Amino acid sequence: MKQEFFNLKINTTGQRLCEFTDQTIQWINNNKFKDGMLNLSIQHTSASLIVQENADPDVQTDLINYFDKLVPMNNKFYIHTTEGKDDMPAHIKSALTNNQISLSIKNNELLLGTWQGLYLSLIHISEPTRRLS
Protein backbone atom coordinates (compact mmCIF):
# COMPACT_ATOMS: atom_id res chain seq x y z
CA MET A 1 0.00 0.00 0.00
CA LYS A 2 1.35 3.39 -1.01
CA GLN A 3 1.27 6.14 1.58
CA GLU A 4 2.10 9.81 1.06
CA PHE A 5 2.09 12.74 3.45
CA PHE A 6 1.53 16.40 2.74
CA ASN A 7 0.80 19.58 4.62
CA LEU A 8 -1.57 22.25 3.47
CA LYS A 9 -1.13 25.68 5.01
CA ILE A 10 -4.21 27.91 5.11
CA ASN A 11 -3.94 31.56 6.12
CA THR A 12 -7.08 32.64 7.89
CA THR A 13 -8.85 35.54 9.49
CA GLY A 14 -11.61 35.32 12.06
CA GLN A 15 -14.32 32.73 12.55
CA ARG A 16 -15.38 31.31 9.21
CA LEU A 17 -15.37 28.29 6.94
CA CYS A 18 -12.44 28.10 4.51
CA GLU A 19 -12.97 25.79 1.56
CA PHE A 20 -9.91 23.78 0.54
CA THR A 21 -11.46 21.37 -1.99
CA ASP A 22 -9.52 22.74 -4.97
CA GLN A 23 -6.15 22.49 -3.19
CA THR A 24 -6.90 18.88 -2.26
CA ILE A 25 -7.91 17.95 -5.82
CA GLN A 26 -4.77 19.63 -7.15
CA TRP A 27 -2.62 17.60 -4.73
CA ILE A 28 -4.34 14.36 -5.86
CA ASN A 29 -3.74 15.24 -9.52
CA ASN A 30 -0.12 16.31 -8.98
CA ASN A 31 0.65 13.03 -7.22
CA LYS A 32 -1.25 10.92 -9.77
CA PHE A 33 -3.27 9.00 -7.19
CA LYS A 34 -5.52 6.59 -9.04
CA ASP A 35 -7.49 4.78 -6.32
CA GLY A 36 -7.31 4.84 -2.55
CA MET A 37 -8.23 6.61 0.65
CA LEU A 38 -7.35 10.15 1.62
CA ASN A 39 -7.11 10.84 5.35
CA LEU A 40 -7.12 14.50 6.31
CA SER A 41 -6.48 15.71 9.83
CA ILE A 42 -5.93 18.98 11.59
CA GLN A 43 -3.55 19.30 14.51
CA HIS A 44 -5.34 22.11 16.31
CA THR A 45 -7.78 21.92 19.22
CA SER A 46 -9.76 24.98 18.19
CA ALA A 47 -10.53 24.21 14.53
CA SER A 48 -12.20 21.35 12.70
CA LEU A 49 -12.75 19.75 9.30
CA ILE A 50 -16.17 19.30 7.73
CA VAL A 51 -17.73 18.19 4.46
CA GLN A 52 -20.52 20.63 3.64
CA GLU A 53 -22.50 22.22 0.83
CA ASN A 54 -20.45 24.59 -1.30
CA ALA A 55 -23.15 25.85 -3.68
CA ASP A 56 -24.81 28.44 -1.44
CA PRO A 57 -22.72 30.65 0.89
CA ASP A 58 -25.78 31.13 3.12
CA VAL A 59 -25.18 27.58 4.39
CA GLN A 60 -21.83 28.72 5.81
CA THR A 61 -23.40 31.76 7.45
CA ASP A 62 -26.19 29.66 8.97
CA LEU A 63 -23.73 27.09 10.33
CA ILE A 64 -21.57 29.75 11.97
CA ASN A 65 -24.62 31.50 13.43
CA TYR A 66 -26.03 28.21 14.75
CA PHE A 67 -22.79 27.21 16.47
CA ASP A 68 -22.44 30.71 17.94
CA LYS A 69 -25.90 30.39 19.49
CA LEU A 70 -25.28 26.81 20.62
CA VAL A 71 -21.92 27.70 22.21
CA PRO A 72 -21.96 31.43 23.05
CA MET A 73 -18.69 33.27 23.50
CA ASN A 74 -19.54 35.16 26.68
CA ASN A 75 -20.66 32.34 28.94
CA LYS A 76 -19.93 33.14 32.58
CA PHE A 77 -19.48 29.42 33.36
CA TYR A 78 -16.30 29.03 31.28
CA ILE A 79 -13.22 28.70 33.47
CA HIS A 80 -10.65 28.17 30.71
CA THR A 81 -10.02 31.57 29.10
CA THR A 82 -6.23 31.41 28.70
CA GLU A 83 -6.24 32.61 25.09
CA GLY A 84 -9.21 34.96 25.29
CA LYS A 85 -12.99 34.94 25.39
CA ASP A 86 -13.23 32.70 22.31
CA ASP A 87 -10.89 30.02 23.70
CA MET A 88 -13.29 27.68 25.51
CA PRO A 89 -16.10 28.08 22.94
CA ALA A 90 -13.56 27.10 20.27
CA HIS A 91 -12.66 23.92 22.15
CA ILE A 92 -16.34 22.98 22.61
CA LYS A 93 -17.22 23.64 18.95
CA SER A 94 -14.28 21.59 17.72
CA ALA A 95 -15.32 18.74 20.05
CA LEU A 96 -18.76 18.74 18.38
CA THR A 97 -17.31 18.39 14.88
CA ASN A 98 -14.34 16.49 13.35
CA ASN A 99 -10.58 16.80 13.44
CA GLN A 100 -10.20 14.09 10.80
CA ILE A 101 -11.95 13.14 7.53
CA SER A 102 -11.47 10.05 5.36
CA LEU A 103 -12.44 10.27 1.68
CA SER A 104 -12.27 7.93 -1.29
CA ILE A 105 -10.31 8.50 -4.48
CA LYS A 106 -11.44 6.58 -7.57
CA ASN A 107 -9.90 6.91 -11.05
CA ASN A 108 -7.85 9.92 -9.89
CA GLU A 109 -11.02 11.68 -8.71
CA LEU A 110 -11.99 12.73 -5.19
CA LEU A 111 -15.43 11.24 -4.55
CA LEU A 112 -17.60 14.09 -3.35
CA GLY A 113 -21.25 14.84 -4.01
CA THR A 114 -22.25 17.51 -6.52
CA TRP A 115 -22.54 20.23 -3.90
CA GLN A 116 -20.03 18.96 -1.36
CA GLY A 117 -16.86 20.78 -0.45
CA LEU A 118 -14.09 20.33 2.10
CA TYR A 119 -13.95 23.03 4.75
CA LEU A 120 -11.67 24.09 7.53
CA SER A 121 -13.96 25.40 10.23
CA LEU A 122 -12.21 28.28 11.97
CA ILE A 123 -13.50 28.59 15.45
CA HIS A 124 -10.76 30.54 17.23
CA ILE A 125 -10.78 34.19 16.22
CA SER A 126 -7.11 35.05 16.50
CA GLU A 127 -4.98 32.28 14.92
CA PRO A 128 -3.83 33.35 11.42
CA THR A 129 -2.42 30.06 10.04
CA ARG A 130 -3.72 26.49 10.14
CA ARG A 131 -1.99 23.34 8.92
CA LEU A 132 -3.75 20.29 7.52
CA SER A 133 -1.98 16.97 7.10
What is the predicted role of each segment?
Residues 123-133:
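Single conserved hydrophobic/aromatic residue that forms the stacking wall/gate
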Residues 4-6, 34-38, 43-47, 99, ...:
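A generic structural signal for short beta-strands and their flanking turns/coil linkers
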Residues 41-43, 106, 121:
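Short beta-strand segments
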Residues 113-123:
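Low-complexity, intrinsically disordered Gly/Pro/Thr-rich segments
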Residues 2-12:
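Short amphipathic
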Residues 16-63:
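Active-site beta-strand/loop microenvironment that shapes enzyme catalytic pockets
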Residues 68-113:
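Mid-chain, well-packed structural core segment of small domains
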